Amino acid sequence: MRKADLVVGVQWGDEGKGKIVDMLGLNYDMICRSQGGHNAGHTIWVDGVRYAMHLIPSGILHKNIVNVIGNGVVVSPDVLIDEMAQFDHLEGRFYISDRAHLNLTHHGLIDQAKERLKGDKAIGTTGKGIGPTYADKISRSGHRVGELLEPERLCEALMSDFEMNKSLFNALGVKIPKRDELLEELKRYKEALAPYITNTTRLVWKALDDGKKVLLEGAQGTLLDIDHGTYPYVTSSNTISAGACTGLGLNPKEMGEVIGVIKAYTTRVGFGPFPTEDKGSDGDKMCEVGKEFGTTTGRRRRCGWFDAVSVKYASRLDAVDKYALMKLDVLDGFEVVKICKAYQYNGETIDYVPTDLENVTPIYEDLEGWDSVKGVTRYDDLPKNAKRYIERIEELTGVKVGLISTSPERSDTIIR
């Protein structure tokens, strides 16, 4: 039996997992999503064409790869149907877990209303209803994709839920759908999605038992994990590598190589602690050159220097075997590049991530910059200072950099 390999984000998401999955995916028979929803964005550049996806695994661009949305994902039918329309002949190469939970219109409306009511205490959610959907799941009041196969029954269950929560809907100013309109919507979902709904756990098991190569595609990043991230400024699922097991029905012994994806700098969307954030011209340059605007929301990402402390912490949580270092070219032209090697915390120097990360001050190490790495495909051809930067990341985190991206194009990648 083969083991499933995993690509996981090791920062606050947006590390460039899509490009790595797209590139490595050519060597796999099946690619699976295990958690998150359409709050996650996958951006891939192929031959100068930009593909942005939020639910469908990146392997969908290759017609010989089977793509799976696992039980740990929360699925917006509207978003999924729109994404599916971009691709031809999905039959036999795309499947949705019947156990994945439904992210419906009212979840997004509730999410947005709660954020508005929080005012300056808002978390910075994408407003896509991910949190409310997972909340319904945990409270055992949610509904799953498999229920779409019986739209009349699901409609009655939802109307009952709405009636039970009428006071909450009214307080938030969220309009309860009309039964007839809801039923028509659910029937439309069934018609579009029914051919792809199945027990994906058995599907993945069979693939592994048959010796197929399976790749798991993580969403968001480790520092957004509901348990181990910068709570409450986190997502609503387990983004660490162990979440891939529960989100697909795999056991830990079925996990193979873990590839941790990191940017050569650091970004974050929304609120929450960010020790190495640069609010000056350097951060602005990273944002402009790196085109740091969210795939899902279009929001400008906060930018700053590489944080080796948080990456080392996340890498331990994920059991990372090697890194894929992304966007090294964005740092081209900086006279000095910085790496956070430790934190100042309560008068002490520490090399770990405390629970109250907002109370740390980064301790930087300055390294000399380089002119350009753009388009380089051989490690030996990199400038000396760029190599030193990569080696210093390895020294501080204890993990080897195995892949290096030097432009958005799939082909501009160094494999060591």
UniProtKB/Swiss-Prot annotation:
It comes from the Bacteria. Keywords: Cytoplasm, GTP-binding, Ligase, Magnesium, Metal-binding, Nucleotide-binding, Purine biosynthesis. The keyword Ligase applies. GO terms for cellular component: cytoplasm. Its cofactor is Mg(2+). PANTHER family: ADENYLOSUCCINATE SYNTHETASE. InterPro entries: Adenylosuccin_syn_GTP-bd, Adenylosuccin_syn_Lys_AS, Adenylosuccinate_synth_dom1, Adenylosuccinate_synth_dom2, Adenylosuccinate_synth_dom3, Adenylosuccinate_synthetase, P-loop_NTPase. Substrate binds at T295, T296, T297, G298, R299, R300, R301. Homodimer. IMP binds at D14, E15, G16, K17, N39, A40, G41, H42, T126, R140, Q220, T235, R299. CDD domains: AdSS. NCBIfam families: PRK01117.1, purA. Gene3D superfamilies: Adenylosuccinate Synthetase, subunit A, domain 1 (3.40.440.10), Adenylosuccinate Synthetase, subunit A, domain 2 (1.10.300.10), Adenylosuccinate Synthetase, subunit A, domain 3 (3.90.170.10). HAMAP family: Adenylosucc_synth. This is Adenylosuccinate synthetase. Plays an important role in the de novo pathway of purine nucleotide biosynthesis. Catalyzes the first committed step in the biosynthesis of AMP from IMP. Binds 1 Mg(2+) ion per subunit. The active site is at D14, H42. Pfam families: Adenylsucc_synt. It is found in: Cytoplasm.
